[in-house]
Structures are given as structure tokens and as C-alpha cells.
């Protein structure tokens, strides 16, 4: 179970690949090999108390699979940090645009798919438990607003039917049951991407409550350039807390510290018009944005806002080729400079 301490979390799922590719991190002014430090301890020394990792079933690039997750989990726990495990139930990114099944599950019928979700989830949690690195929380699926494990669990567009929702929820419940079979007191999060969209958030979670899905935490993504303003976020989070009486975590967020791209690297956020009003793309602007963002969560009624996770704050442009098959467009949305030096915004 997670502690009651406010979660200052970071998703650093790329760390394993960055380190193996020669990337390094520094908390001091001297960014040289002999001054490199373990990222986990830099984060911890600056107020971070929890780490999120994604897990893919059989990723082509070999990172974020079970074997590598077991290794990273040991490092997280050795550093004295809490651990959130993010099941994608895919061999690659699972998000609102893609929720493809693992290749090994493609030909299973629905009963077989449901069983596979249960057994895989149980096995992963049991293996983590057996090596003394039990997650403090798991999330069943990643940004599953449109469902997961398409097409059996797809619920957007023409797939938004009663039958499809029942199948989707059956798959989610199989994941929850698998996690609970391995650890009955394990906290479970259900994560969607609509941090500032109350009608969509309510439509989704109403379905889960109507079906009696047993979960502990509402998880939301919030990126201002895609989702809206901090006022929009505040309104949605406060209404969700009142409606469902569940703990809430904003489990993905980020903000730029510059709009200047490192040479040869495109950026997802590269224009002034993508910025939130009042927060320039500077280290100071990023710092102020994060302070105000955290304040929104801390002030959710009845203490229901229990924390946040910053998505890939350490995805520095240390290499051109990545196992995920696309470029790094995130290097100005980090809490480290392009060379791996800690920014002043990394203080919680």
C-alpha cells in the first residue's frame, strides 16, 4: 500500500536504456564522467519519493520488459523509494491512439485473453514480491479512455457499445484480480488521459462504478498543451473527488523549460502558442508551473489529491536511436538540461 505522504513521483522508464547508451546525470555544475551520479539518488535528494515504471509484455527493443523491470525495481527499493508499476498490456505504447494486444495474445479468444491478463498480472506481481520489490501500487492499463487490448476491449467511436464496455471491464477486472491474487492489499489505479475534461472523465468512471469495479485510485494525465488550463484541471479534479470519493493522482504531466531544440532533435512542444498563459518556457516558468500544478492537487477537497508523477523528467537527448522506434521529442520537457545536469525546477 502507498503511504499517506503526498507523492512527488517521477516516471523514469527510459533510464535503463539511457544508462546503457552512455547517458549520465549530474546535480553539480561539473558535467563530466567522474561527477556522474545515480539518477535515483539525485531525485530522492530533491524531494522525490516515488518512481513509476511502465511494463511491456515483449517489446521489440528489449527495454521495459519483465526482466528489465525486475532489475529496475531492485534499484528503486534499494533507494528507499515507493514504486508504481504501469501495466500497458501491449508490446509497445498503449495510449488513447493505440491499445494493441501483445503479439503472443493476438489469436486468443476472449476467454483466453481474459485468462492471459489475469495470469500475466499475477505472475509479474508475484515475481516482484518474491525478490522483495513489491510495488506500492499498480495501474491496470495505461490511458485507457478508449479501452485496452483492442479490439476486444475497445470502447471508442463505433465500438462504444454496452457489449464492448462489458468486455473491456471484464479484462480490467481480470487484471485487478491477478494483482490482488498476488498481493491482496495492493493499491490499484485506473488511469485515463482526460485530466481537464470532466464530461469525458465522468462518462468513463461512471461506467466503472456502475459495474462495481473494485479499484482504489483515479489516475489522470494532464499536459496543458493538449488538455487545457490549470483551472480546467482544478475543476475536473474537484468534481471527481466529490462525485466518487476516491483518492486522485495526476499520474502524468510535464512542462517545457525551453523551446530551443538540441541539434537534430524535434520537439513535441516547440511554439509559444503551446504554452500555458503565465508560464514561459524557462526554468523559472517551469518551476512556477509545477508549484501551481501541485497546489491544484494539494487543494482537492477532503485531502483526496494524494500526489503526482512527472512523465520522463530525465529523457535527455543522449542518443539518436531509441528502442521505441521513434525520436526523442521530449528533451525540453525534462527536469534536466540536454547534458543531464539537474535544473533548479527539480526541487519538491
Question: What would you call each of these model-derived segments?
Answer:
Residues 2-39:
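Boundary/entry segment of secreted carbohydrate-active catalytic domains
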Residues 10, 43, 86, 124, ...:
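Conserved, mostly hydrophobic/aromatic
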Residues 12-21, 83-95, 248-264, 306, ...:
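Short, solvent-exposed beta-strand-terminating loops
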Residues 12-15, 56-58, 88-92, 140-145, ...:
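Active-site beta-loop-alpha junctions enriched in small/polar residues
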Residues 19, 23-34, 57-67, 145-148, ...:
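Acidic-and-aromatic substrate-binding clefts and catalytic sites of carbohydrate-active enzymes
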Residues 20, 27, 157-158, 235, ...:
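Aromatic-rich peripheral "rim/lid" segments of glycoside hydrolase catalytic domains that contact
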Residues 36-41, 166, 181-187, 198-276, ...:
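Glycoside hydrolase catalytic-domain groove-lining segments
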Residues 40-187, 193:
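Substrate-binding cleft and catalytic face of glycoside hydrolase catalytic domains
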Amino acid at each position: 500500500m502507498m503511504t499517506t505522504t503526498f507523492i512527488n513521483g517521477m516516471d523514469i522508464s527510459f533510464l535503463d536504456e539511457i544508462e546503457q547508451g552512455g547517458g549520465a546525470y549530474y546535480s553539480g555544475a561539473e558535467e563530466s564522467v567522474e561527477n556522474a551520479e545515480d539518477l535515483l539518488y539525485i531525485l530522492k535528494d530533491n524531494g522525490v519519493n516515488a518512481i513509476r515504471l511502465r511494463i511491456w509484455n515483449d517489446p521489440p527493443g528489449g527495454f521495459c520488459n519483465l526482466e528489465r523491470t525486475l532489475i529496475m525495481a531492485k534499484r528503486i527499493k534499494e533507494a528507499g523509494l515507493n514504486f508504481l508499476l504501469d501495466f500497458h498490456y501491449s508490446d509497445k505504447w498503449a495510449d488513447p491512439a493505440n491499445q494493441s494486444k501483445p503479439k503472443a495474445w493476438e489469436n486468443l479468444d476472449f476467454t483466453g485473453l481474459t485468462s492471459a491478463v489475469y495470469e500475466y498480472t499475477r505472475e509479474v506481481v508475484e515475481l516482484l514480491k518474491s525478490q522483495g520489490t513489491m510495488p506500492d501500487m499498480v495501474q491496470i492499463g495505461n490511458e485507457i479512455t478508449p479501452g485496452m487490448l483492442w479490439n476486444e476491449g475497445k470502447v471508442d467511436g463505433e465500438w462504444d457499445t454496452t457489449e464492448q464496455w462489458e468486455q473491456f471491464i471484464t479484462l480490467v477486472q481480470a487484471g485487478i484480480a491477478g494483482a490482488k491474487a498476488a498481493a491482496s492489499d495492493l493499491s490499484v489505479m485506473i488511469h485515463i488521459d482526460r485530466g481537464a475534461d470532466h464530461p469525458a472523465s465522468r462518462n468513463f468512471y461512471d461506467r466503472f462504478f456502475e459495474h462495481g469495479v473494485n479499484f482504489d485510485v483515479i489516475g489522470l494525465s494532464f499536459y496543458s498543451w493538449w488538455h487545457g488550463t490549470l483551472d480546467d484541471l482544478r475543476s475536473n479534479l474537484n468534481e471527481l473527488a466529490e462525485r466518487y470519493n476516491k483518492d486522485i493522482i495526476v499520474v502524468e504531466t510535464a512542462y517545457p523549460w525551453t523551446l530551443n531544440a538540441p541539434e537534430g532533435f524535434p520537439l513535441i512542444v516547440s511554439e509559444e502558442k503551446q504554452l500555458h498563459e503565465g508560464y514561459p518556457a524557462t526554468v523559472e516558468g517551469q518551476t512556477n508551473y509545477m508549484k501551481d500544478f501541485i497546489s491544484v492537487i494539494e487543494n482537492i477537497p477532503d485531502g483526496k489529491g494524494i500526489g503526482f508523477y512527472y512523465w520522463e523528467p530525465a529523457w535527455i537527448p543522449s542518443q539518436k536511436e531509441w528502442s521505441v522506434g521513434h525520436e526523442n521529442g521530449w528533451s525540453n520537457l525534462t527536469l534536466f538540461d540536454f547534458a543531464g545536469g539537474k535544473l533548479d525546477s527539480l526541487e519538491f
